[in-house]
A protein has these predicted regions:
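Acidic, glycine-enriched active-site microenvironments
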Residues: 59
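N-terminal intrinsically disordered, cationic/polar leader segments
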Residues: 1-50, 54, 65-94
Length: 94
């Protein structure tokens, strides 16, 4: 049973990191692995953040403390980066 629990923990972490990578690409922080280019789409980044928020809501009370912290830390980091990128974009328009 412990092996299944560890496997699920790894899969949960992988799911979070997949959304995190997609958000970082949309924020223009990471290169798109397909195009090898950096481009920014804040609407798309917001979508990935909302997916992670939904995951937090739907899994509340059903994850380990470790899994909870991974998700909360990822969300916090992405939200800060989103605010930074959005403010850069606003300053660039002024």
């Amino acid at each position: 049973m412990e092996d299944k629990s560890k496997e699920q923990e790894k899969l949960y972490s992988y799911l979070i990191s997949t959304f995190q990578s997609s958000a970082l690409i949309a924020l223009g922080i990471m290169k798109n692995p397909m195009s090898k280019e950096i481009s920014q789409n804040l609407d798309q980044a917001s979508y990935y953040i909302k997916l992670l928020e939904m995951l937090e809501h739907k899994t509340k009370g059903n994850v380990t403390e470790y899994e909870k912290q991974i998700l909360l830390n990822t969300l916090s980091d992405l939200k800060m980066k989103f605010i930074e990128q959005k403010s850069k974009k606003v300053r660039g328009k002024s």
